[in-house]
Amino acid sequence: MTVQRILIVSGTHGNEINPVWAVKQFSRKENSLNNGIEYEYIIGNPAAYEKGCRYIDVDLNRSFKESGNFDQHKNSFYETNRANFLVDEFGIDGSKPCQIAIDLHTTTANMGTSIVMYGRRSKDFCLAALLQNKFGLPIYLHEKDKAQTGFLVEAWPCGLVIEIGAVAQNFYDQNIVNRFSLIIGSLREEIDKLKNKLVELPKELVVHVHQGSIDYPRDEKGDIDGIIHPARINQDWKMIKKGDPLFLDSQGIIHKYERDKLIWPVFIGEVAYKEKKIAMSYTKKEVICSKKQWVQEFESF
C-alpha cells in the first residue's frame, strides 16, 4: 500500500462546529505523521465557519462536480472556488496529493454515529467494513440520486463521510467531540493495519441504500403544512411499514406511509434539508459479502 497522505476535512458546513473542535484537540495530541502516512487537517469552508452559517453562496458539499466547475474564472460562488482550491491543493493531482479524504459532519437528526458512502467503490467499502466491524456503525450508501451530486469525498479515489448526531447547529457538545476523536483515531489505526497487511475483513457488511426522499406536507401556496409525527421523531434507522405515521398537519390529520415496501428512514427532520425540501430520506437494507478485491485495490494505490 502506497498511501502517503490523507485529508481530514471538518467544517465543510460552517455551522457544524464539533468536528472542527475535535480535529483541533486531536491534532494537538497526535502527530500528523503516522507510520509514514501524513495527515492533512483542514477546515473545508473557513468563511462559513467564521460566520457560523452552513455556507456563503452554495452548499460546498454539492460543489465538487465532475466537469466544468474547476475553472475559478468562470464562477463567482465562494464555495465553487473553495472546491477548486481543495482539489488543486489536495486532490490526487494536487500540490499536496491525498489518496483518501475523510469528511466529518454533524446532523440535527438522531443518526447516532454513522458512515456515509457515495457509490460502490471498493476502497470505500474496505474502510467502511472495518469501521462497521469495529463499532457496529450503520452505513448509509447514497447513490443514483441525480438531485444530489457533487459531494466532497467523490473528488478523491477513496473517501468516507462520518456523520454524528443529534446535535444542534453551532452548539458544542463534548460527547460528540469525543466520538469524532475516537473515530479519527480508529481510522488511523485501521489504515495503518491496511498498510502493513494486518487486516481481516468481516464476512459481510450491512448497508442502508438510498432510495429517495420525502418532503413535508405542503399547502396550496407551497408552504410547509405539517411536522414530523411524534412517533417518528428520533427514529432514524428504524423500519417503517405501510400505515405507520409520518407527519401531522396543521388540521391534525395524520399522514401515513402508504406503500407496501418496507423502508428505513434517515436524516429525519434534519434542519439543513428543509431548503432542499427533504423531511427525511429513506433506504432499503442490503447485506453485502466482503470481497478480497476491496483490500487488493487499497494495496494498488
UniProtKB/Swiss-Prot annotation:
It catalyses: an N-acyl-L-aspartate + H2O = a carboxylate + L-aspartate. Binds 1 zinc ion per subunit. InterPro entries: AspA/AstE_fam, Aspartoacylase, AstE_AspA_cat, Aste_AspA_hybrid_dom. Its EC number is 3.5.1.15. It comes from the Bacteria. Substrate binds at residues 54, 61-62, 163, 273. GO terms for cellular component: cytosol. Coiled coil: none annotated. Pfam families: AstE_AspA_cat (PF24827), AstE_AspA_hybrid (PF04952). GO terms for molecular function: aspartoacylase activity; hydrolase activity, acting on ester bonds; zinc ion binding. HAMAP family: Aspartoacylase. PANTHER family: ASPARTOACYLASE, SUCCINYLGLUTAMATE DESUCCINYLASE. This is Probable aspartoacylase. It comes from Prochlorococcus marinus (strain MIT 9301).
